[in-house]
Amino acid sequence: MICITCMRPVDSLYTVYSNDHIQLTDCPYCQETVDKYVEIDNVLLFIDLLLLKAGAYRHLVFNALELHLSKYPKRKALNDCQCLRDYTQALLFNVKNWFCKYDRLNRLWLLLLSFEIYLTWVTEESKYIYYLNRNNNDGKLIMLSKKLPESFKWDSAIMRNTITSKVFTWSPPIQYLYFASYCILDVSLFHTFTQYFILKKLHWKHYSVSSKDVISYTILLSYGAKIFPILMLIWPYDTLISMSIIKWVANLYIIESLKIVTNLSYWNIIKIFISVSLLRYFMVKPILIVFVAKFNFSVIKNLIHQEFILLLQKSGTYLLL
């Protein structure tokens, strides 16, 4: 447990007296209340999370998480098992204990992923229709240069040969499976690479709660901001620009929340975020292309080539805002 103000370790958050009266503990280092959110309603806590209050994040990620995880036994070491029966029992115990321990977090991830899948599906469909109908002579389209290379000039026919075009020829259930795979892979890579860079490269760790659990919970809380674009489906706008702006705001939430929890410099957090984003961009779709092409090398090569050409064309033009 820590003080949410100075992040120093403390022995307790509050003291319970005989009449069930609770007195919050004062931090011996900064003299502030160790964790005022112990007595604050969950609605107010949620509002403070949206406002990126440092204390709200630290309360949930450090103190609340530690109290929750301490209720469950530690995992059994599989290396200590002497026979197959002991190994199987220990493995089953660890699996059951993991599902019980992280049940609430897993349900939150499932909820967020459900929204993310739907938003990704809607966004990709809107982009596909937009780019398919895009015309190089459209007055809204401004070329960055009048003498762009031929490969940079927009050709809407390219969209008909991409993986997105192939996906939208499938039935809705198969489309949903594709976008579910896309989102799960994207979130998994973001989660894995972020943990790797913070824990392994920057050697950040927390003394009491598992550092992996801390980073994982922080990502979960900040990832909730990525469902904000659902509002764009309730109050639709004419272009995709507003949705893109909201998505970038969600990215800022992730950066700020990681800064609050890890106390690393903004420069380190931004470097990690950019690196992870680039890795996701160049890994998620190629991996899915391999499966969509059914490991056919010529089809894989063609789809990746079309995606690369599409990327060049998008980089060669931009919308007049």
Curated annotation (Swiss-Prot):
Keyword Repeat: no
A Pfam family annotated for this UniProt entry: Arv1
Main location (coarse class): endoplasmic reticulum
Keyword DNA-binding: no
InterPro entries, A to Z: Arv1
Gene Ontology BP, a term: sphingolipid biosynthetic process
Record's bilayer topology term: Multi-pass membrane protein
Record-level GO cellular component terms: cortical endoplasmic reticulum; endoplasmic reticulum; endoplasmic reticulum membrane; Golgi apparatus; Golgi membrane
Protein family according to the UniProt entry: Belongs to the ARV1 family.
Function: Mediator of sterol homeostasis involved in sterol uptake, trafficking and distribution into membranes. Also regulates the sphingolipid metabolism. Required for growth during anaerobiosis and sterol uptake.
Record's protein name: Protein ARV1
Species classification: Eukaryota, Fungi, Dikarya, Ascomycota, Saccharomycotina
Gene assigned in the entry: ARV1
